């Protein structure tokens, strides 16, 4: 297993919808509405992927796709990069930021939520109990978001960032989460 971790031809970019659902499930994303359903508006237009919106019966992308550059030059494929571009990547990161900081809420362009108030939110109740020990908080997020694969240098960067400012407990949790969704260990599977 450790040999595969260092093999440059092993690994894959996780699909946007998988990363989004992983965050939601890890932090018990739940509806604030009485009828308990959640509507993510405009996913297919912003992150180029949404449930039941694939362009063919086979998937969201061709299995033999390889992006230009090192991956295709070495004869490897990376199908999940077919739906990844500058705009969709930024939309996903912006969506993570809105979801983490405000919950599922309509933003300026009308995407993501359907209301001007939060339809659903992430539950930070467990994580708030870890804010007294920043390392425990980072280790917890490493486990639930990165599967325990967080590199030491990534962990140190996050701890330095958390120690560099005074946060309220909830702001510390949100700040740490915003850092985690940008990590290679969260976005790439080895």
Q: Which residue ranges define each predicted feature?
A:
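Flexible, low-complexity segments enriched for small/polar residues
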Residues: 1-190
């Amino acid at each position: 297993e450790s040999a595969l971790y260092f093999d440059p031809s092993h690994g894959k970019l996780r699909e946007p919808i998988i990363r989004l659902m992983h965050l939601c499930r890890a932090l018990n994303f739940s509806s604030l509405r009485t009828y308990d359903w959640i509507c993510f508006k405009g996913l297919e237009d912003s992150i180029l992927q949404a449930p039941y919106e694939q362009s063919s019966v086979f998937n969201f992308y061709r299995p033999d796709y390889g992006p230009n550059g090192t991956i295709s030059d070495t004869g490897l494929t990376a199908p999940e990069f077919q739906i990844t571009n500058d705009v969709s990547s930024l939309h996903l990161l912006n969506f993570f930021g809105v979801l983490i900081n405000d919950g599922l809420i309509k933003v300026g362009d009308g995407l993501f939520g359907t209301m001007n108030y939060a339809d659903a939110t992430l539950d930070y109740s467990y994580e708030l109990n870890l804010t007294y020990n920043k390392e425990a908080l980072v280790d917890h997020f490493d486990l639930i978001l990165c599967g325990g694969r967080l590199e030491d240098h990534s962990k140190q960067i996050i701890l330095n960032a958390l120690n560099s400012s005074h946060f309220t407990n909830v702001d510390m949790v949100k700040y740490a989460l915003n850092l985690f969704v940008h990590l290679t260990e969260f976005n790439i599977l080895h």
